[in-house]
């Protein structure tokens, strides 16, 4: 694997609030994408009491070549997960929470009903908390993402992940145009929803391909785009083609704003839920 340039070196996770967040997550039996995906921002986010909770278990039914989450045969759903999640959010006094999940192709609805139960439980136990959901694509799960849109989270996030040319090699079980369709439809079903999508760079894409993804997302009326550097989790994962410079990320940000996105987060360490609360407040101010 390539050695990381200096702009990608994050501080090691330490601190009293970090440990408190970790203990609360473990106490309530929660999984976080911060841990499972080895996110470089875990120290900064957890010290701000920001965490992205991963529901539907910790085992994914897919094996995308960029992702560090375990794959295999998942366990049964935990019926207490929505309540435990809401209690943990209340204990941590989170004003903003991001809920994501593994892919559950084994479930009839892909786990959509569990997302809805989590939204409802949070609204009941800690109604002041803003809820962002980051869902899988629910491919071939009729009515799944539509039902979540009706449940009215504050933000509906679904990552496009990469330019379409790379799908066959890196995420062969996903479909680029299905993801665009999902993003377009949730906005049509619930026009009040703020929609968001994320793109990784450094996998071999061209600038022209990145700009085309921006155009596709704007055609789907996506409000907010995140662009970040792909980092290879282990030697067995997809290789990094190159490290995109901070200056190039700034250029992408400028172009994305010129194309009509309300909020753009574009930097080497940007991830889907990095600074999510601050960006949500900016997004509301733009509307």
Curated annotation (Swiss-Prot):
Metal-binding listed as a keyword: yes
UniProt-recorded Gene Ontology molecular function terms: 4 iron, 4 sulfur cluster binding; lipoate synthase activity; metal ion binding
Catalytic activity, reaction form: [[Fe-S] cluster scaffold protein carrying a second [4Fe-4S](2+) cluster] + N(6)-octanoyl-L-lysyl-[protein] + 2 oxidized [2Fe-2S]-[ferredoxin] + 2 S-adenosyl-L-methionine + 4 H(+) = [[Fe-S] cluster scaffold protein] + N(6)-[(R)-dihydrolipoyl]-L-lysyl-[protein] + 4 Fe(3+) + 2 hydrogen sulfide + 2 5'-deoxyadenosine + 2 L-methionine + 2 reduced [2Fe-2S]-[ferredoxin]
Localization (cell): Cytoplasm
Cofactor dependency: [4Fe-4S] cluster
Amino acids binding [4Fe-4S] cluster 2: 60, 64, 67
Signal peptide: none
Statement: the UniProt record of this protein carries the keyword DNA-binding: no
Metabolic or biological pathway, per its Swiss-Prot or TrEMBL entry: Protein modification; protein lipoylation via endogenous pathway; protein N(6)-(lipoyl)lysine from octanoyl-[acyl-carrier-protein]: step 2/2
GO cellular component, one term: cytoplasm
Co-factor: note: Binds 2 [4Fe-4S] clusters per subunit. One cluster is coordinated with 3 cysteines and an exchangeable S-adenosyl-L-methionine.
HAMAP family, per database record: Lipoyl_synth
Family classification: Belongs to the radical SAM superfamily. Lipoyl synthase family.
UniProt protein name: Lipoyl synthase
High-level lineage: Bacteria, Pseudomonadati, Pseudomonadota, Alphaproteobacteria, Rickettsiales
């Amino acid at each position: 694997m390539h050695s990381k340039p200096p702009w990608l070196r994050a501080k090691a996770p330490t601190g009293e609030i970090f440990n408190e967040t970790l203990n609360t997550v473990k106490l309530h039996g929660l999984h976080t994408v911060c841990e499972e995906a080895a996110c470089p921002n875990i120290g900064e986010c957890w010290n701000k009491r920001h965490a992205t909770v991963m529901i539907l278990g910790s085992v994914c039914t897919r094996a995308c070549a960029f992702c560090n989450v375990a794959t295999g045969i998942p366990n049964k759903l935990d019926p207490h997960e929505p309540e435990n999640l809401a209690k943990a959010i209340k204990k941590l006094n989170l004003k903003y929470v991001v809920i994501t999940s593994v892919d559950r192709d084994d479930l009839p609805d892909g786990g959509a009903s569990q997302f809805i139960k989590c939204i409802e439980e949070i609204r009941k136990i800690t109604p002041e908390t803003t809820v962002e959901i980051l869902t899988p694509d629910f491919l071939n799960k009729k009515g799944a993402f539509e039902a979540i849109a009706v449940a009215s989270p504050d933000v509906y996030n679904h990552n496009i992940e990469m330019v379409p040319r790379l799908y066959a090699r890196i995420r062969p079980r996903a479909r680029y145009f299905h993801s665009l369709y999902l993003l377009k439809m949730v906005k049509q079903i619930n026009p009040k929803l703020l929609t968001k999508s994320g793109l990784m760079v450094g996998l071999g894409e061209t600038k022209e391909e990145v700009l085309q993804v921006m155009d596709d997302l704007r055609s789907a009326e996506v409000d907010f785009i995140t662009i970040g550097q792909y980092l290879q989790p282990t030697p067995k994962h997809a290789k990094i083609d190159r490290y995109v410079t901070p200056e190039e990320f700034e250029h992408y940000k400028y172009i994305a704003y010129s194309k009509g996105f309300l909020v753009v987060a574009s930097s080497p360490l940007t991830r889907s839920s990095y600074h999510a609360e601050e960006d949500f407040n900016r997004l509301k101010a733009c509307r």
